[in-house]
Amino acid sequence: MLRTTMVLKMQGYWAVGSGKGGGNEVDNRIDRDSDGLPYVPGKMLKGLVKDACLRLKNAGNKNYCFVDEIFGAVDSNENMNRTTSKAGKIYFSDARLSPQLRLELSKSENRSAKDNLTRNIYSTAIDDETGTADDRSLRGYEVAVPMDLYARMECDCDKTTFDCIKKAAGKLVRAVGSHKSRGLGEVVIEFKDEA
């Protein structure tokens, strides 16, 4: 089993959430872990990295023929279900703040330290003819500030395949979460291999 630490260097505001609203304040809140801190689920990371590898495979790169074997696949016939799917050989943990920062934030006497990790941003639609905001078009989003998040990646594969997966993630995963077309979620992915 090969292991590495995936470092997500969030370059700007980002939002990973389920679309749940926050009452009158915002329409979409970000997801938080059990400590109330922003995070990126491992399932999302797996999907982003699989997509990066699939793009290289579909472009004709023979080094990426492993995608179904490593990430898992469903039966190609029409009656797809969990019993006919093939399990993958790769695992991603949730991407979270560093243990040191998590410890500091848990010691904080006031909630403002955690609150400083998020912001609310707003947008509205503008009427082209009048140049004013359309009625009922104001939307609010909770976003997380730029930060580094850490996830574990483990794979039951050879080193060449593992290196190809890391290369695809580092080169092709450019954004994480929602509202990417509006500039949110820009990320740089790096890896810290174990000695």
Predicted regions and their residues:
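RNA-binding basic/glycine-rich loop and surface signature characteristic of RAMP-family CRISPR effectors
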Residues: M1-T118, Y122, D134-A195
